[in-house]
C-alpha cells in the first residue's frame, strides 16, 4: 500500500510538471479483469474486479475511457458497429444478479457453471461466441425469475424505464421480435418487404398498414419485447451503480461514439440517411483504393428544417449525445471525428476514389451532387472581389 501511494504521488507530481489536469485510463469494458474463478468470458465494469480496477486507477487517473457500449451481433464482435442507443447485454455482470441487491434473479449454480465452462477461463482473452449464447441464457433465467417473483421495486423500475426511453427502446425491441419472425437479424434480406420499412412509411396507406403490422408483431412477441427491455434495464441499473462508485473515487467515465450505425439503427432511421451514399476513407499511404466502410451517412438536409430548428436527423443526434453525456459524466470521445464533421463519402457499389465520384460531404463545391451540401470557408472567398465590383 505504501509503495502504491508513493507511485501515485510521483505520477501526480509528474502531471503537474507537464501541466496536465486530465489523465484518462483507456480500456474496453469487455477487457476489464475478473476475480479468480469468476471469469465468464467477458469483462464488466460493474463487477467486483471492475471496482478494484477503479480503486487502482483512482489517485492517478481522473477518468476511464471505455469503448462503444452498444449491442453487438453474434457474428460481429466489433463494438464499432454496435447500436447507438441500446447497451450491450454482455456488459451486465452476472455475479451481481446472484445477490440480494438484484433480488437473486440468477442462481449461483448457473453463474458458477458459466464461469467453469468458459473455454478461456485461464487465458487473458474473451470468449465471445461462448459468452454471447451463455449470457443470453443466464439473462433468460433471470427474466423468468423476475416474472415469477415479481419484485415490486424492479417491476416499477422497468415500467419507468420503458416510459422514459420509449423513443429508442420500442424500435430496438421490435427489431428483436422481427428478427425472430424473419429468421435472421439482418433486415435487408428479410422476406417480408413491409417488415423492412415498418418505421419509415412513405404514405398514409403504408402508415396504416405498417401500424397494424407493428401491433401484430408486438402482440405475438410480447414476451420477447419485454425481455429485451428487461435486459436494457439491468444494463442501465448496473451502469448507474458503476458511475456513482467511480465518482466517489473521483473517476469519471468517458463514452466512445463510433461513426457507424448498426443494422438495427439503419432499419429504424433509414429515412434519415443519404440514399445511395456510404461513409469511408479516401486513398492514402495505407490503401491505394481507399477504405469502403459501408456505413450509412446522415442526410444533411434532414439535420435542420428551413426555419433553423432541428430536423428529424438533428433530433436523433441530439437524443443520442444527450443520453451519452448523462450516462458518462466524463464526456464523449468521438471516433474518427472528421467522419462527423466532414465525412468522406462514396457511391454505394463504387470505390472511395475521387474518379469514382467520392468526395468530402461538406467541402466539395465543384462536385456534381455534393456541391449542394458544401459549406463555404474563408479559403473559398475571393477577397479581390469587393461589394462595389
Task: List where the protein language model places each region.
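Alpha-amylase-like alpha-glycosidases and glucanotransferases acting on alpha-linked glucans and related
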Residues: 4-39, 75-236, 260-389
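Catalytic domains of carbohydrate-active enzymes, especially glycoside hydrolases
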Residues: 17-18, 45-73, 323, 327-331
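Hydrophobic faces of well-ordered beta-strands that scaffold small-molecule active sites
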Residues: 23-27, 62-65, 253-255, 332
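A short N-terminal beta->alpha junction/helix N-cap motif
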Residues: 40-44
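Generic structural signal for well-ordered alpha-helices
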Residues: 50-54, 143, 239-243, 321
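Conserved, mostly hydrophobic/aromatic
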Residues: 57, 66, 175, 246, ...
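Short, flexible active-site-adjacent loop segments at beta-strand->alpha-helix junctions, enriched
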Residues: 70, 181, 257
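Conserved, well-ordered alpha-helix/loop/beta-strand core segments that scaffold catalytic motifs
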Residues: 228-260
